[in-house]
């Protein structure tokens, strides 16, 4: 069983969702974590994380080199 690891971090949930969609459009499954922290504190200290399977992290990093938010 693979663990989820952080591929990217953003200040706003919409930025994280766009990144997730970009990854998924390139065949890398991703989920967004910590959106609830934004509800209570805009630009929360934790940030909003985009998570991928550990086994997909290298591919996610390769794909994100071309990502322009």
PLM feature segments, named:
Residues 1-69:
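Acidic/polar low-complexity segments and flexible, solvent-exposed patches
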């Amino acid at each position: 069983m693979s663990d989820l690891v952080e591929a990217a971090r953003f200040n706003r949930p919409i930025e994280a969702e766009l990144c997730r969609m970009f990854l998924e459009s390139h065949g890398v499954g991703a989920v967004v974590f910590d959106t609830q922290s934004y509800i209570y504190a805009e630009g929360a200290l934790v940030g909003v994380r985009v998570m991928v399977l550990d086994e997909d992290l290298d591919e996610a990093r390769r794909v994100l080199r071309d990502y322009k938010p």
